[in-house]
C-alpha cells in the first residue's frame, strides 16, 4: 500500500471517529450534547472547506464548494440556536424558515458546480449561468416572509404569531420540494454520465454511493423517527444531508472529476521518468523512484 493511500485511510478513520463520537453523544443524551455535536460537525466541515481552498484549481468550482460549506455551517448553527437557545415561538418559527436558505441553495450550488466539470480554468463561462439562482432565491424569500402571506405554511386562524404545530403545507412548500428534487435528479444523471469510463462499460461508483445513501435515508426517515433507538442514532436529517453532500463532492475530487492540486506523490511513485519537486529553498520534497 502506498503512503498516499495509507494517509487517506488514516484521515478517513479520523473522520469516522469524529462522526462516531457525535453519534454516541446523541444516542446517550450527554449533557450539552447538541452544542458539542454541532462543534464537532463544524470542525469537520470547516476542515474540508480549508482543504478545498488549497486543493481545487478551478476558481469557480472552488467558490461553489466553499459557498456550500458556508451554507452547511449556517444550517448546523441555526439549528443549534433553534433547539438550544431560542425562547419564543416567533423566534423558533423564523429560525425554522431560515432552514430553507441552505436547503434550497446547497442543491443549486451542486448543480451549478456541474457546469465547470468539463471546463478548464481559461474556458469561457456560460453567459447566463447566474440565472439558476433566481428561482431558489425567490422561493426562500417567500418562505422567510410566510407570516405575511402563508403561501408556504398555513396556520390556524388566530395562531399565526404563536406558530401552531397544526399547520398545513401550501404550494410554495411543494415548489421548494420540486426544486430540491429536480436539482438532485439532474446532478445524479449528470454524474452517472461523467462517471462512465470512456471506451468501457465500467462506471466510477464512488461519487454515486453517498447520493444513494442520502436518498435511501430520506425514504426511510419517517420509519427511523418511529423507532426509538434508530431515532437516537440516525434521526438527524440536517447532519446526514450535510455529510452526504460533502462526501459526494470529496468523492468527485478523489476520482478526478473535479480538478485538484493533489496526486503528485502517487505520480512520482509510479513515474519512470527522472524528476523532482523542491520547496522554495530548493530542498527536494518529491522524487521519482528512478531518480533515487
List the model feature ranges, each with a label.
Residues 31-46, 56-145, 174-177, 237:
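Individual alpha-helical transmembrane segments in multi-pass integral membrane proteins
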Residues 290-292:
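Conserved small/polar residues in nucleotide/adenosyl-binding loops
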Residues 54-76, 97, 129-133, 167-222:
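Alpha-helical transmembrane segments of multi-pass integral membrane proteins
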Residues 21-30, 78-89, 143-157, 217-229:
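Juxtamembrane "helix-exit" motif on the non-cytosolic side of transmembrane helices
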Residues 252-287:
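Sensory modules in modular signal-transduction proteins
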Residues 8-13, 27-41, 143-187:
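Extracellular-loop-to-transmembrane junctions of the mid-late helices
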Residues 2-10, 21-31, 189-263:
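Interfacial "cap-and-anchor" motif at the non-cytosolic start of specific transmembrane alpha-helices
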Residues 7-22, 67-74, 134-137, 210-212:
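Alpha-helical transmembrane segments
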Amino acid at each position: 500500500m502506498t503512503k498516499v493511500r495509507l494517509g487517506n485511510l488514516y484521515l478517513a478513520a479520523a473522520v469516522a471517529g469524529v462522526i462516531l463520537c457525535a453519534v454516541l453523544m446523541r444516542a446517550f443524551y450527554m449533557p450539552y450534547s447538541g452544542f458539542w455535536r454541532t462543534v464537532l460537525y463544524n470542525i469537520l466541515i470547516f476542515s474540508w472547506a480549508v482543504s478545498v481552498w488549497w486543493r481545487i484549481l478551478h476558481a469557480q468550482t472552488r467558490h461553489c464548494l466553499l459557498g456550500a460549506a458556508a451554507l452547511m455551517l449556517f444550517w448546523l448553527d441555526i439549528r443549534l440556536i433553534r433547539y438550544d437557545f431560542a425562547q419564543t415561538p416567533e423566534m423558533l418559527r423564523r429560525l425554522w424558515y431560515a432552514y430553507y436558505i441552505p436547503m434550497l441553495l446547497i442543491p443549486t450550488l451542486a448543480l451549478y458546480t456541474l457546469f465547470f466539470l468539463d471546463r478548464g480554468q481559461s474556458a469561457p463561462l456560460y453567459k447566463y449561468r447566474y440565472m439558476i439562482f433566481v428561482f431558489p432565491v425567490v422561493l426562500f424569500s417567500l418562505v422567510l416572509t410566510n407570516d405575511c402571506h402563508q403561501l408556504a405554511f398555513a396556520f390556524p386562524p388566530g395562531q399565526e404569531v404563536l406558530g401552531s404545530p397544526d399547520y398545513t403545507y401550501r404550494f410554495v412548500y411543494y415548489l421548494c420540494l420540486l426544486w430540491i428534487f429536480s436539482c438532485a435528479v439532474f446532478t445524479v444523471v449528470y454524474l452517472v454520465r461523467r462517471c462512465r469510463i470512456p471506451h468501457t462499460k465500467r462506471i466510477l461508483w464512488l461519487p454515486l454511493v453517498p447520493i444513494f445513501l442520502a436518498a435511501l435515508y430520506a425514504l426511510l426517515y419517517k420509519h427511523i423517527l418511529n423507532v426509538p433507538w434508530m431515532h437516537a442514532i440516525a434521526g438527524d436529517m440536517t447532519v446526514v444531508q450535510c455529510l452526504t453532500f460533502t462526501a459526494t463532492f470529496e468523492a468527485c475530487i478523489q476520482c478526478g472529476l473535479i480538478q485538484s492540486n493533489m496526486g503528485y506523490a502517487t505520480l512520482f511513485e509510479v513515474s519512470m521518468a527522472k524528476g523532482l519537486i523542491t520547496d522554495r529553498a530548493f530542498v527536494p520534497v518529491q522524487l521519482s523512484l528512478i531518480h533515487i
